[in-house]
Amino acid sequence: MSETVKFTLDGEQVVAEKGMTIWEVANGRGLVIPHLCHKPAPGYRPDGNCRACMVEIEGERTLAASCIREPQEGMVVVTNNARATSARKMVVEMLLADLPEREKSHDKSAHMWDMADLNGVSESRFPKLEEGHIPLLDDSHVAMRVNLDACISCGLCVRACREVQVNDVIGMAGRGR
């Protein structure tokens, strides 16, 4: 029998298997916590670097990325208060500033747009990336089509290539311009 941990999630006492993340527990209970760098599929490990899944943990000064944080016994987690939702909204707004408008995007149905909708964000109040700095679609290789205008530098595609497909043919470059 596996070990369990009891904690409070949005006012409800829940029991989770040790090793599960807050995001996994919430998702299993039908709660939707926005996420971008985490893919809930076999072989994909969460990294927590996009910060789109932030939640508040009682007694902690900073918000926590729910996709990498494991609940502890007696922990009180809040996913839907003003602080957590405001932080997630801010993250999405900052990311949208570096992307082309949805109408000009190569992939109008991208997960990023779904998460923007979920957070109630249709546009960013931050300065847009200059048109000349938005990467073009690269379909120069017969086996890969790279759409960097949708890139938020979360590393999901690199992890998928390296850890799931085990071929390590893509990487990150030019971050932090």
Predicted features along the sequence, with ranges:
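Basic/polar N-terminal segments that are highly enriched at the extreme N-terminus
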Residues: 1-3
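N-terminal cofactor/phosphate-binding cores enriched in small/glycine residues
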Residues: 5-73, 87
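Fe-S ferredoxin-like electron-transfer domains
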Residues: 51-177
